[in-house]
Amino acid sequence: LRLVGSEMCIRDRNHNEPEMPSSVFVALVGRPNVGKSSLTNHLVGEKVAIVTQKAQTTRNRITGIITKGPVQYVLLDTPGIHKPRNRLDSRMTQTAAASLKDVDVTLMLFEPTGEFTESELGMVEALRKAGPAIAVINKVDLLNDFAALEARKKQVEEFGIFDAIVTVSAKDGTGCEELFPLLKQYANPGPHYFDDDAFTDMPEKELVAELVREKALLFMREEIPHGIAVTVESFKERPDSDLIDISVEICCERKSHKGMIIGKGGQMLKKIASAARMDCEELLGARVNLQCWVKVREDWRDNDRLLDNLGFAKP
């Protein structure tokens, strides 16, 4: 106790000294649809990860960057941990696991109620060996039962691996700001890795592709969206205007799916393209001419060559 008091006195006496720059790398892991991307977007203050109600929306590791004074927080939003059903799923699961090796601390998100999945329990065991971790119980806005929330906190505490347990709502922001002082404790001194005004390291083309895929996920029937991949084939800024011409390929697994994506009279494809174009214009700060094309690549989720070509690199 005396030592803690002495440390506090020293800190107080030197409070006017400027803090040195530091950075902390943070992985966000958890089951599909637990709110990792929503939390990333809320903390960053920008849309860097697409969000839908469908599980497994995030496929690649997404980087969000926040700089608060001398501290830069680098968030790695990972695919949801689940039992793989194809080679794409396997790569997604490997990406989530590999992220634990690249960070200073891990945020593991949990639902406020319900049983823990086998994949969640496996991730908890992986965290025992990986390093510091903080538990984040999300979606508390959906829970009015204080006793149930306390019971959930106790369940998570019993894992015995988390330095802290935080309750948040990524939807309305409740408790989210409390994460920054906790994460700051794991920061390492040194120059920032990214510009202080950066919010992601994702290329513009990749962001555009994700926005198109988000609209397909939102508008398409359940059986189709997870068989879709999106790539930007061309991205050209016109030198004489503020217009950007973008050509996008939407890849699907079945000819029947191609017809559904295009829709009667092309209406579904127009709906997807129109909604994506508006988001692209907001992202790029310019007018966008977005052309979307649909191509069939049968069983691409189980084809390593196609996965490589579509940008799903092995971690």
Report each predicted region and the residues it spans.
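Walker A/P-loop
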Residues: 37-38
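Switch II (G3) loop of P-loop NTPases
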Residues: 46-50, 72-88, 112
